[in-house]
Amino acid sequence: VAAGLVGAHPVLFQAMQAALAPGGHAYLDVPTAIISKRPGQLPRLSGPLALGSSGAEDFLLEYLDDKPMQDVAWGRLDRAGIARLLALHPLAYTLTARPAYIADRGASALADRIESALESGPKLTVLVGHDTNQALLAGMLGLHWSLGGYPADDPPPGGGMLFLLSHDARGTPYVTLIYQVQTMDQIRNLDVLTMANRPAMAALPIAFCGHRAAPTACTLAGFTRMIARTKTRVIAR
């Protein structure tokens, strides 16, 4: 499967080859594999997709850190080139985080904590995690997004999932999920975020909710049942 993804995106991987080692060692010749060293460990990749995903993220971090462009990817990429190669990052997650079997196990504890906060927590609960946590939640909840100039479904640095609880006129509680990211240049320039210079935001449909009153709203009861079903699947498997 991993080798098939490499073969399906030749232009993207050739562009990464040009950024990493133009005229040098062909990293595309390295065998591609999915690795899991021990039970309970999230799978990892080896080969071109692993190198491409981590390399693209490294180039992004160099750009966000406001390094001179001659020091970003050895001066071989501009911002558009970085954004293009960054598509390798979510591509890797289609194998290591988004599949249901992996996502259910990797995100169920975090989803349970989110559910608890929505049902009986304080008005504001802040949970700090990693891009992998977001990719796992996305796989578990069936989330997809494209905003801020990043590739589709890429969880960039500083991205946040906002689970908002509201009530309709009858008092029925609903969960709305907002995904928020700062653009590359907002982070690179340390922009002050204001109403006139906002981060990119989008309300995401929770595809696996099952009881959606609107495309981007899920009843709290439906959200709770969805989390319960996920935990049941994890135990059953």
Give residue ranges: language-model regions.
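Signature for phosphate-centric chemistry
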Residues: 1-125, 131-237
